[in-house]
C-alpha cells in the first residue's frame, strides 16, 4: 500500500502546485488590470532620460502604480544606479 500512497501523493502535490501557480498568475493579472495604459511608455521615457547621464540596464528601473479606495494614486519609481562615474 505504501507504493500506491506514494503515487497518490504525487498527484495531490502536482494539483496543489498547479493551483498555486494559477493563483499567482491570476493575482498578477488582477494587479496589472488597474494600471494606466501609458505606464510602459512612461517607464521607457524615464529610462531614456536616465541613460543620458548614467549607463543603466532596463532591469534597473522599477515602476509601480498603486491606487487605493480613496482614489489616491501613487507612482513609485525605483532606480538602481551603478557605482560608476556619470557619463557627461
Swiss-Prot record:
<keyword id="KW-0131">Cell cycle</keyword>
<dbReference type="GO" id="GO:0032955">
    <property type="term" value="P:regulation of division septum assembly"/>
</dbReference>
<comment type="function">
    <text>Prevents the cell division inhibition by proteins MinC and MinD at internal division sites while permitting inhibition at polar sites. This ensures cell division at the proper site by restricting the formation of a division septum at the midpoint of the long axis of the cell.</text>
</comment>
<dbReference type="InterPro" id="IPR036707">
    <property type="entry name" value="MinE_sf"/>
</dbReference>
<dbReference type="GO" id="GO:0051301">
    <property type="term" value="P:cell division"/>
</dbReference>
<comment type="similarity">
    <text>Belongs to the MinE family.</text>
</comment>
<dbReference type="Pfam" id="PF03776">
    <property type="entry name" value="MinE"/>
</dbReference>
<protein>
    <recommendedName>
        <fullName>Cell division topological specificity factor</fullName>
    </recommendedName>
</protein>
<dbReference type="InterPro" id="IPR005527">
    <property type="entry name" value="MinE"/>
</dbReference>
<keyword id="KW-0132">Cell division</keyword>
Amino acid at each position: 500500500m505504501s507504493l500506491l500512497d506514494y503515487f497518490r501523493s504525487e498527484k495531490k502535490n502536482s494539483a496543489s502546485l498547479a493551483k498555486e501557480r494559477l493563483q499567482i498568475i491570476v493575482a498578477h493579472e488582477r494587479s496589472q488590470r488597474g494600471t494606466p495604459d501609458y505606464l510602459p511608455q512612461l517607464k521607457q521615457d524615464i529610462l531614456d532620460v536616465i541613460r543620458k547621464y548614467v549607463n543603466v540596464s532596463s532591469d534597473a528601473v522599477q515602476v509601480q502604480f498603486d491606487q487605493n479606495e480613496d482614489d489616491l494614486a501613487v507612482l513609485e519609481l525605483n532606480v538602481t544606479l551603478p557605482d560608476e562615474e556619470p557619463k557627461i
